[in-house]
Amino acid sequence: VLSEADHTLGLTSEPEVLTSAGNPCAGVEVRIVDEDGKDVPVGEIGEVITRGDHVMRGYWGAAGQDSTVTKAVRDGWLHTGDLGRLDQHDRLFLVDRKGDMIISGGYNIYPREIEEVIAQVAGVHEVAVVGVKDQEWGQRVTALITLLPGAQVDSQQVMDHCKASMASYKKPKEVRIVESFPLNSTGKIAKKVIREQLEAE
């Protein structure tokens, strides 16, 4: 939760504070862990896990026998699947979804960061960045965009903007302009479907 003091701080001297989810509520524990479940240093990115009275004990019935769901709660800790970091004041910053992270050329790349940069290009409506299997890189950063009605944007404009705005290893290897995106049951862009479609080409 962001406190009144956090809002004041964010509006006067530290605007990044307002991009955080704030501090854990009373009775809620939050940790940032690596793949082995060990805490990462302050400021480093890892999976967000949480414990407290708000966390379920497990799943009822048949779902409780399914390892794909039971692995979410382990030893009382809910493994959220979100990637984030804690600052020195224990504020939580969410970075991306763990399943969306791209590993390319040995680098961990967070699609949301690239999507936010591409969204700055005038005329871009929606953006989806995914990692596509690649023999050379492991995964290839690929960006798909839809445009606002009447907008005239080409792939090279987007590539040039990325080149000027981010580290070289994060830049998309390919930018595609599409008419629409497949959506999941909650109305969000279905990145898994996009990834599968691209890899099937």
Would you name each region that the model predicts?
Residues 1-91, 98-101, 114-115, 150:
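Conserved AMP-binding/adenylate-forming
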Residues 175-178:
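General small-molecule cofactor/ligand-binding pocket signal
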Residues 198-201:
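A short, polar/charged loop-to-alpha-helix boundary motif
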